[in-house]
């Protein structure tokens, strides 16, 4: 049994926004509200970053077209007592997916939990 940090990518669509800052604020609020409703306040929510194909600079993954925004977000959760990395991935997707219905979740990163990172998370019990 292992302990893992799982980072998932999630595209969040928001409506009635004018700027990318508005889109980010609404998306963070929308995700936080959904997670808190399921008592998942220990999930860390961060804005995703994209890389410019020309210059290589990083920028926030928030795009607005016609008052509709698309915001890329990273959701980080700690999973305890998972049998394998794949098991940790399934647990993370199930837990976060329950709160964010109809939002596709893709694994961005999975790594073993270090002693400094231990804290609140999801524990799997057989």
From Swiss-Prot:
Under InterPro entries, the record lists: UPF0212
Q: Which Pfam families match?
A: DUF555
Signal peptide segment: none
Similarity field: Belongs to the UPF0212 family.
Q: Mind telling me which HAMAP family this protein's record contains?
A: UPF0212 (MF_01223)
Stated name of the protein = UPF0212 protein TON_0350
Q: Which organism is it from?
A: Thermococcus onnurineus (strain NA1)
